[in-house]
């Protein structure tokens, strides 16, 4: 797992796309020879991985949306992004 700071600015790298699979009615991350099906929360996080929002900003936005504590959300966001970064689905 990759350690992530609050000020890291995640983005989806070249060659990876966030896309809606209309056949399965699911959001997916598409990469060369790989596909990752996303749940609603993962999709909400990845939409904000635009190269502008930092991890703290993403966590704050999601805390507002889901009416949860920012610190709790940030822990989950960091864990998810760390796993995705280790698999090269996001860059920091």
Name each region found by the language model:
Residues 1-47:
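Acidic, low-complexity/disordered tracts enriched in E/D and polar residues
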Residues 34-92:
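Long, charge-rich, low-complexity alpha-helical segments
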């Amino acid at each position: 797992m990759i350690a992530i700071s609050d000020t890291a600015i995640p983005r989806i790298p070249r060659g990876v796309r966030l896309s809606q699979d209309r056949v399965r009615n699911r959001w997916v991350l598409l990469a060369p020879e790989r596909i990752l099906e996303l749940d609603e929360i993962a999709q909400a996080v990845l939409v904000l991985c635009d190269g502008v929002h930092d991890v703290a900003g993403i966590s704050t936005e999601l805390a507002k949306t889901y009416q949860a504590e920012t610190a709790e959300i940030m822990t989950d966001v960091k864990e998810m992004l760390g796993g995705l970064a280790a698999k090269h689905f996001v860059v920091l």
